[in-house]
Amino acid sequence: MKAKWIIAGAGVLVFAGAMPWAVGYVTEQQWQEVTRELNQAQPFVQMQTDHYDRGFFGSELGGVVTVLNPESGETRPIAYRAKVTHGVTGSFIDFKPVEGWAPEGANWFQERPRLTLETRLWGTAVLELEAPAIAINNPESGESLRTSGGVARIEISDAGSQAEALVVWPQLSFSGPDMSMRIDDFRVEHKMTHLEGDIWTGTAEASMASVALKSPEAQPLTIEGLRAHSSAEADADGQRLNSGLSIEAGKVRYKDQAYGPHKVVFALENLDVASWSALTTSMAELQGMALAPDADSQGAFERQIAAMDAVNTAARDLSAAGFSVGLPELVLDTPEGKVTGNLMITHPELSADQKAEMLMVMQQLTGEMNLSVPLVLAENYPAVRMQLAPLIKQGFLVPEGDRLVLAARLNDMVVDVNGQEIPLPPLF
């Protein structure tokens, strides 16, 4: 019996001793797969691994991350290196920029930031950035950035089909010659589950206790209790998708007065998942082609035309499947009362025969829009009056008691605004 236990113990020791090597091998394969998928999924961040030196209990790797600015098309390469520690069930990777976290001679951080990746054999990975307090000054522009320490964390599980993100930054402030801004208690939480293609379901919430804006040419403005909540949910069979975004502010403080709450809601309802996935994918491909180095070549032009055709086909399929989009709720509190409104546009679901006869997406669209503004708001504030004057002059906003109201209906490519019919041009 004693011999059996000795043999079993020896087997466990051999297994435990061999696991770091196996973990290191799996980690290298996972790293190659993740970087390949990241590069294929989008053009904005491209990862290149120049070397991966795998040892028994640890590894070293290095390469270049290339970040693309979508506005200018400029790229910035950032060389990195990392040390990998192999454990029994996973690995721990510690990343560092080769040129440091700040330019030479700059003292941006009180302590060194830490960027780590923890992986597990069963497909779970946790990427975490721990940042100390930051102080960045630009003497030439007179701008400065100050932040407290913060943390950003992303956990990926179920072979990449689920993800959770958390960002916590107690304080951020930016100041310049024209404006200064301070944000307190910034927090983001995001939970996602992959549905199909580029489509994910889940919830996300971002909040800030307060946002304070100051300018030499204007009164201070403070927004308290700012919160954004988004959700995307599929039906039981995963064929239809409902998505929504609400933005709320508890109070807005201006000139020693407080107004609130404020709320705006955006909604996408009853989307066909396959068509929506095809539309988002083809639009992403079109954007990527526009940013590609050979965007002006004949071959690139032909690929762009094909991508545009794919976008049009996906939009047509999405419309034929039926959907609703709009702003179900708008509430803004002002010194003179609330501004309220809503806007919804709907396309009915079409049969196969109706889809074959479908000439334009717009032809079947129906919609409704309502807006109500306190009349005294336009009378007492010249800036508001200037914005509303054209609508009042054309009869789009009409007096109704102590309010200015707009009531619009869309049907058969004609918009009825307070009794005035306006034909729509056939745009798409």
Over which residues does each language-model region extend?
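Glycine-rich, small/hydroxylated-residue low-complexity segments
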Residues: 5-7, 15-428
